[in-house]
Amino acid sequence: MVRRDRLRRMREWWVQVGLLAVPLLAAYLHIPPPQLSPALHSWKSSGKFFTYKGLRIFYQDSVGVVGSPEIVVLLHGFPTSSYDWYKIWEGLTLRFHRVIALDFLGFGFSDKPRPHHYSIFEQASIVEALLRHLGLQNRRINLLSHDYGDIVAQELLYRYKQNRSGRLTIKSLCLSNGGIFPETHRPLLLQKLLKDGGVLSPILTRLMNFFVFSRGLTPVFGPYTRPSESELWDMWAGIRNNDGNLVIDSLLQYINQRKKFRRRWVGALASVTIPIHFIYGPLDPVNPYPEFLELYRKTLPRSTVSILDDHISHYPQLEDPMGFLNAYMGFINSF
């Protein structure tokens, strides 16, 4: 009798916990995205949108040096946005006539459809469509990329080499801290859990919050160059815009695509004839030193490399903007 009473009380307790948890969970899942900071709001307001197959794509397009024919297109990394380039933006406008960056589909202020099969191929096609939209499809383009953007740049380079219809005419390519080799790439734990699209993926993406995001992203920065809390909130606001946290697992399919299409994308780099450069933050846990750099130099012996200070990690353009900009300008002015 005593045991039955105890079991009954336990059941009642769990029912009460469940009744309390349901509205709390519902409230958690409907937390609105954070307000944009003044700086991020200004970035959005100064940008524009164009439409690609019914989807809105955000981009920035600044006119810099008058009379210069030079154009640079910036390709951002995962899981952030074109705002990653804001620290070097003004410096680029002092060298280039046009400085252009976009938020890839599923990132930043661009649309984030779901369900959707996100792919590197589609992102490359969006870059090509943007330049057609701007009337620059026949101009020679300098590509500057980071992380995820490096893989998109590899596909654009492949199309350029194959003389594909609609492809960009690439003048130069500068990569930075991207996992261009599947065998030396070390994805974070959450990326490993989400990239295979298992039963946990929709749960984890819905439960992701600022705390989880910031604790996951901060370790890929150097110990002296980690972002402030306000900078992390700007990154998180870009992800949460249009419920972007719910498509992270779909976007991460690029890890599997990179392995599947290694020959295509690494082959495009290995046989490159245009000027190519790599800017490297050597403390990067995602593309670790020295394994990554050894393979890069072996695969691309013609490429030049800039290694930044020892404490610079995975986001060199944010951690050491002046060092990054100087390295890039040194490359651009070398040919």
From Swiss-Prot:
Location relative to the cell: Endoplasmic reticulum membrane
Domain of life: Eukaryota
InterPro entries linked: AB_hydrolase_1 (IPR000073), AB_hydrolase_fold (IPR029058), AB_hydrolase_sf (IPR050266), Epox_hydrolase-like (IPR000639)
TM helices/strands, residue ranges: 13-33, 63-83, 266-286
Keywords: Endoplasmic reticulum, Glycoprotein, Hydrolase, Membrane, Transmembrane, Transmembrane helix
Gene that produces this protein: MEST
Glycosylation sites: N163
Record EC number: 3.-.-.-
Name recorded for this polypeptide: Mesoderm-specific transcript homolog protein
MF-aspect GO terms: hydrolase activity
Organism encoding this protein: Homo sapiens
Gene Ontology CC annotations of this record: endoplasmic reticulum; endoplasmic reticulum membrane; extracellular exosome
Motif (RVIALD): 98-103
Gene3D superfamilies named among the record's database cross-references: alpha/beta hydrolase
Tissue expression per record: Highly expressed in hydatidiform moles, but barely expressed in dermoid cysts. Biallelic expression is detected in blood lymphocytes. Seems to imprinted in an isoform-specific manner rather than in a tissue-specific manner in lymphocytes. Isoform 1 is expressed only from the paternal allele. Isoform 2 is expressed from both the paternal allele and the maternal allele.
Topology in membrane: Multi-pass membrane protein
Biological-process GO terms, alphabetical: mesoderm development; regulation of lipid storage; response to retinoic acid
